[in-house]
Regions:
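Conserved ATP-binding/catalytic motifs of P-loop helicase motor domains
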Residues: 209
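Acidic/glycine-enriched connector segments
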Residues: 1-206
């Protein structure tokens, strides 16, 4: 199964996602700025590539009612987050959903907003309620203009989400036992569904194993 996981080289959610991706044989792409501790072990993104994110970060800051960081390292992490979202088909986030159901708290919220602004689908495991949510767009007429509004809706009774061909997994450094279990279950149900097991079996037969 040709799938790969994109992550940002941090602790907590990032580390566990990388461990699970390796366990299931996924390709892994780690995106870090040049001054990140992980840059010693993987090729960092160049400054020229990172700064391409600056206009998007400014737009996200406006929607999040936040200021763009002025500290170089903090800004470089947001630039990294933009490129994580850009390269992913779908983003799986583990964080705290705000009361307005439109934003996610902390650094994870920046990545989620950057993904939404790029039209990416986002699945959120809300660590407040330990429930899955999905991003959903609605369109309103405001001042004679069509305006898109994205909010998070409860997953409901549908089969829980599974990883896609190109998935980014993002979240907090500090993860609870419930969040840890949710991350592990995400990978497990992706690769243990009957249709996925059958695909792996056929690929192994093709290799005469």
């Amino acid at each position: 199964m040709d799938m790969y996981c994109i992550r940002g080289g941090g602790d907590g959610t990032d580390i566990l996602a990388e461990e699970m991706a390796r366990e299931y044989g996924m390709q892994i792409e780690v995106i870090v700025p040049p001054n990140h501790p992980r840059a010693k072990f993987t090729s960092p993104a160049s400054v020229e590539v990172l700064i391409q994110a600056d206009p998007a970060i400014g737009a996200a800051a406006h929607k999040l009612c936040k200021r763009v960081p002025t500290h170089f390292y903090t800004l470089s992490l947001l630039q990294r987050n933009y490129h994580i979202a850009r390269k992913a088909h779908t983003v799986f986030a583990f964080g705290k959903l705000c009361a307005d159901k439109k934003r996610v708290e902390g650094g994870t919220g920046w990545t989620v907003q950057l993904a939404i602004d790029q039209g990416k689908e986002v699945f959120l495991f809300d660590t407040n309620t330990n429930q899955w949510y999905r991003s959903e767009n609605t369109y309103n007429i405001e001042n004679s203009c069509l305006k898109k509004v994205t909010s998070f809706k409860p997953w409901g009774t549908l089969r829980l989400p599974t990883l896609h061909q190109s998935s980014a997994v993002v979240g907090s450094r500090d993860i609870t036992p419930a969040t840890r279990a949710a991350i592990k279950n995400l990978f497990q149900r992706t690769f243990c569904l009957p249709e996925n097991i059958e695909q792996v079996r056929l690929e192994l037969e093709g290799l005469h194993l």
